[in-house]
Amino acid sequence: MQQFFLPAEPAASKEPTEQLRRASIRQVAEYNARFAGGTRPFRPPRGCRIDTVCLTPPPPTGAGAPEERFFAFFREAREVFDGAELILSPPETAPVRTDFSRRGVRGLLRESALFEAFFRAAYRTSALARTSILLPFVSDPTEADAIRRCAERALRTLLYHREPFDETIPIGIRVETPAAVLCGRQLLEDWDFAVADADSLAAFALALPQGERPTPCGAEILRELTEKCLETAHVCGRFCGIAGFLAADTSALPRLIAHGAGGLFLPPEALPAVSGALAKIR
């Protein structure tokens, strides 16, 4: 397993100190491509330095090889955020909450040619910048072998064409359902890091429509789910970040930090407020 986002000087004890947790938390700008053709998707917020970017390209449509379109998307981000670490996610093939058979990696495994194209583009990007891969909607430990086979086929193709790449890049999972939280230890045995997505957990645990915020009782349930995910990751020695509305909730930051959140995956417009809140906590 590859180490991911770990501090340069680990604490001597097994339990991380509060100071270490605060020092190691990372802010990640999320760019999930939902933009019209010709519009630049990458607009860094003013006054914030971005060290890590999470990128989800649009599903490929029309003419052009999917691999080249993914690679062009990632390469542009690398040029805009020169020196930043890139966390690359494949696009959803069918982001419909009611159709679990086509969500995340399940849908991508059914469209293996597209999934392999993503892996090839991601590994090619690793020759240009420090890179990680983040897989969406992984909730079943038995999916790991099929995902690995898909990645291995992509690597063999790159080797055949003598493309440069880093084969050791970390691969993580996005935890989006209560089931994934409950079987977190089995899932994390196969992956290098995790990101708990509060928006998806709200949708599946509380049946909330997209964009609707939970009641205080529902919010407490979500905090317990994300904290369980963080604690499981800590026991397994894995990095765990938080995405969704909880990551941008400045009032929740002290509690997330206390439970060992290693990173906050945020829309770019939320970065200034969260940066200010973190500075006050420190």
Report the location of each language-model feature:
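Conserved alpha/beta-domain cores
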Residues: 2-282
